[in-house]
Amino acid sequence: MGSMVSAAEQCGIHPYTEGVLTIARHKRNPISSWNPRRVQSYYAQSQSDSRLVNGRKLWKELDGMNNLNIEVFNWFWSNKLFFPLEWCERKNGKPVFVFFWGTILLTGDGKPCVVCMWRENNELRRGYRLLDSMFDANSPAAQYTF
């Protein structure tokens, strides 16, 4: 448990607690029928070449795309076997945190954040990162292609 938890903490991931977070902006997913083959992890242009990008800038770049929201996040959490394993394969020895940009939440002290999932010791974990944090090439967006 140790090294992955440390990596999550180093990446600015906070534990996900349902009662503490409130919805600031929620974009509905216009998915009429679910097809797991259409779910993908997406890296924004600003994340190429392992660059760090501020979460607010990344959010603007991803806005208008088919980003999965907290409803899908909660569905994956309840149905962990359906969460794509390949999304969590380590890149450059670092864990991959998959973010659900379709919903922006607020922490208890009003800071905007986005929820994420990752694998730790073959177990799915969840958390969130503040938008004022930096995101890298190990921080893809969960999206649906039509």
Language-model region placement:
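A binding-site-centric feature that preferentially detects glycan-recognition modules on secreted/surface proteins
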Residues: 1-66, 72-146
